[in-house]
Amino acid sequence: MTSNLTKTEIKMLCLENGIENFEFFNFCSINKSVNIYWSNPDKECLTKNWVFVLNDNENRTLKCLVIPPNSISEIQLKTRKDKPYKLDIQIDSDNVNLRDTRSGIFFGRWLIKTISY
């Protein structure tokens, strides 16, 4: 059974599990047809204390990434062609290192907690 959490519910679960002090917060859920976590956050996230949550609503887990400001430069990631102020992140859900298939960056280095719900 899948569970679709709202952004507010995910934020609350993060706070309840000690993940706080974020300046930029976003989440995405797995696109099961391609096994990709797909996200298009604003580029400003790169200069903020960024909490990026990957929601596996089938297995009911949240992978919580905390990415410090300026850990990734804008040129390391791909942007959307139609909205160049947005990043185009596609993380392979089958890759234990959470590799972005577009840029090759491994997001797993910023994984600090997995929360079951």
Please describe what each predicted stretch is.
Residues 2-117:
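Nucleic-acid endonuclease domains
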